[in-house]
Design a protein with these regions (language model features):
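Long, ordered, helix-rich scaffold segments
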Residues: 2-270
Length: 270
């Protein structure tokens, strides 16, 4: 590290036997010292709570965030304080509080449902990813709220929904389709079409075929439906594209079908 000539660093002594000393260690820029402070404060438990809560008010948001990561480890009162931060006016505090509760193994069903309605898209994305570790029954309400607020443009948002739905894609897609009133493909919004593309369930194939064949949709929308079928890793997908290739009249769409048949035949379907 570059330093002025004659510079002598003043390294503070490490005191992990007191709450104040451990708190100073937690504030350290050195990750190893910070870890020691974190562990020491964990061991102090409820007796360190007041001092850690004071750190929440620090003007340095990074130091305040360290307090949130620690709070759920300080007994039931610390966990309750963390839960209250899920309703903070500060979006960063809400996000870190949600993540810190997850890390402690807290049952996140109720918290996920609450924050699935959050006004901040970044927080909803985080909630969506966390649903990966919940069952369909536990997560379906949160998925519905998150899907309702998708603008159809945010690629990270739709990817978060896909990651969260891993292993239960068909159930999530059917639930969203029915609850959002998209039982017929002409009713679909572009947002739901993109969610369908990401979830990649074979349950969507008949609806996607209908979109490809329906001339009321734009060429781009029909191409996107072809692409959505192509990304479905199920035996019904190549059969559907083959059938469409034999019935679609537009050369532009047929070229897209052939391109995807070749590409996927050499990779996912090969």
């Amino acid at each position: 590290r570059i330093a002025p000539k004659g510079f002598k660093p003043d390294v503070p002594s490490l005191d992990l036997k007191s709450v104040d000393g451990s708190l100073n260690a937690l504030k350290s820029p050195n990750p190893a010292v910070r870890y020691l402070g974190f562990q020491a404060l964990k061991n102090f438990g409820d007796s360190a709570l007041l001092k850690v809560e004071e750190l929440l008010q620090d003007k340095n948001s990074y130091l305040a965030a360290r307090a949130i990561w620690l709070l759920p480890h300080l007994g039931e009162n610390g966990k309750k304080k963390t839960v209250t931060l899920l309703r903070s006016k500060n979006r960063d505090q809400r996000l870190v509080a949600y993540r810190s509760l997850r890390r402690t193994g807290e049952n996140m069903v109720t918290h996920a449902r609450a924050l699935s309605k959050d006004t901040d898209a970044g927080i909803r994305r985080d909630v969506a990813i966390s649903l990966r570790f919940l069952s369909f029954d536990q997560s379906k309400d949160a998925f519905l709220e998150i899907a309702k607020q998708f603008d159809g443009q945010d690629k990270n948002y739709v990817e978060a929904i896909g990651l969260g739905a891993h292993g239960k894609e068909s159930q999530v897609w059917e639930h969203l389709k029915n609850k959002l009133g998209f039982q017929k493909s002409p009713m679909w919004t572009n947002a739901f079409a993109r969610i369908t593309w990401r979830l990649g369930t074979n349950k969507a194939i008949p609806y996607l075929k209908e979109r490809v064949q329906n001339t009321e949709f734009s060429i781009e929308q029909r191409k996107f439906a072809i692409e959505s079928i192509a990304f479905i890793n199920h035996p019904d997908a190549p059969d559907a594209l083959l059938e469409l290739g034999n019935t679609i009249q537009e050369e532009e769409l047929n070229d897209v079908i052939v391109e995807w048949m070749v590409r996927q035949g050499l990779t996912d379907w090969g």
